[in-house]
């Protein structure tokens, strides 16, 4: 095993996150290591958030994000909150600025332990989401699943929140749909040349929504922060809600809410929610071999 690094198993609303400290190193967590870690029931995850030394002035770190299949992700809101909690515990600071491949993220930990992340501006242009076909209005695109005359799902809102999202509006409980069956079909639909995150969204009031997500590169997930942001923005964009909503993530464990604001003054999306540390260890970023840090657990207790 090469020199190991510290990592923490965390979650954001049940979204399984591995936060890996790669600071001071020039190598990266490899796709092979990600696949190996996800194959182990003790370390299976939705995203890896690898913290690297900053590359840009005015930032605290560069965050490299991997999905459980080893592919790259551009954004992960729940994972970003986990990184903030980990670094706040380490440094005593509350505010951080991160660079990702999708851009700059600003985040702050509040006194109540919740964390707000400025996810930046949403993208609606069809060729920047991207979509395979030109749509003048991406708030409702032509896509459906099921019989032509009685589709199960149809006419999603499409956008990017650093990564591509399709939001399907439903009237029934989002848990009543077999998302595990048709999620992969929609994720890999030819309409999405870079694949897409697929979310079912039910508007329950002008200020509340319920969502469930099939995550690109990770599959059926307990929660997805960028999907919640995309659902909130798409709901406001189509007149279903206002710009401030509470998102009930239907499959989150434990049950919890995300607060999303699509800020009018600058169009930035602000996501606020919890993060939770579970346990820590060390891993080889090349192979995914790992060990648990029992001493840290005793200290935390």
Swiss-Prot record:
Could be important to modulate the pK values of the two catalytic cysteine residues (site feature) positions: 165, 215
Pathway: Amino-acid biosynthesis; L-lysine biosynthesis via DAP pathway; DL-2,6-diaminopimelate from LL-2,6-diaminopimelate: step 1/1
GO cellular component: cytosol
Compartment(s): Cytoplasm
Catalytic activity, as annotated: (2S,6S)-2,6-diaminopimelate = meso-2,6-diaminopimelate
Domain of life (superkingdom): Bacteria
Binding site for substrate: 15, 47, 67, 77-78, 163, 197, 215-216, 225-226
SUPFAM superfamilies: Diaminopimelate epimerase-like
GO terms assigned for molecular function: diaminopimelate epimerase activity
Key words, A-Z: Amino-acid biosynthesis, Cytoplasm, Isomerase, Lysine biosynthesis
Active site (UniProt): 76, 224
Known EC number: 5.1.1.7
First-listed, main subcellular location of the protein, grouped into a coarse class: cytoplasm
One of the GO BP terms on file: lysine biosynthetic process via diaminopimelate
Function in brief: Catalyzes the stereoinversion of LL-2,6-diaminopimelate (L,L-DAP) to meso-diaminopimelate (meso-DAP), a precursor of L-lysine and an essential component of the bacterial peptidoglycan.
Family to which this protein belongs: Belongs to the diaminopimelate epimerase family.
Record text on subunit structure and interactions: Homodimer.
HAMAP family xrefs: DAP_epimerase
Protein name: Diaminopimelate epimerase
Species in which this protein is naturally found: Rhizobium etli (strain ATCC 51251 / DSM 11541 / JCM 21823 / NBRC 15573 / CFN 42)
């Amino acid at each position: 095993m090469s020199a190991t690094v510290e990592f923490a198993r965390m979650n954001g609303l049940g979204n399984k996150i591995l936060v890996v400290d790669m600071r001071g190193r020039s190598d990266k967590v490899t796709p092979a290591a990600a696949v190996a870690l996800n194959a182990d029931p003790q370390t299976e995850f939705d995203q890896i958030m690898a913290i690297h030394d900053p590359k840009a002035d005015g930032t605290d770190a560069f965050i490299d994000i991997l999905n459980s299949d080893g592919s790259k992700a551009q954004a992960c809101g729940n994972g970003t909150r986990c990184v903030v909690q980990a670094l706040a515990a380490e440094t005593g600071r509350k505010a951080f600025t991160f660079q990702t491949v999708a851009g700059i993220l600003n985040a702050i930990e509040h006194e109540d332990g919740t964390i707000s992340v400025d996810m930046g501006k949403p993208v609606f242009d069809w060729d920047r989401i991207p979509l395979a076909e030109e749509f003048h209005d991406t708030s409702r695109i032509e896509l459906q699943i099921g019989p032509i005359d009685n589709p199960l799902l149809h006419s999603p809102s499409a956008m990017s929140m650093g990564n591509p999202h399709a939001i399907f509006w439903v009237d029934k409980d989002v848990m009543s749909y077999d998302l595990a069956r048709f999620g992969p079909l929609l994720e890999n639909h030819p309409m999405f040349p870079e694949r897409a995150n697929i979310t079912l969204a039910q508007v329950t009031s002008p200020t509340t929504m319920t969502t469930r997500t099939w995550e690109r590169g990770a599959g059926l997930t307990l929660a997805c922060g960028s999907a919640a942001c995309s659902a909130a923005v798409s709901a406001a964009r189509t007149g279903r809600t206002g710009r401030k909503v509470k998102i009930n993530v239907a499959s989150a464990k434990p049950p919890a809410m995300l607060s999303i604001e699509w800020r009018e003054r600058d169009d930035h999306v602000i996501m606020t929610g919890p993060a939770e540390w579970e346990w820590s260890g060390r891993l080889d970023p090349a192979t995914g071999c790992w060990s648990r840090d029992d001493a840290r657990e005793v200290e935390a207790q």
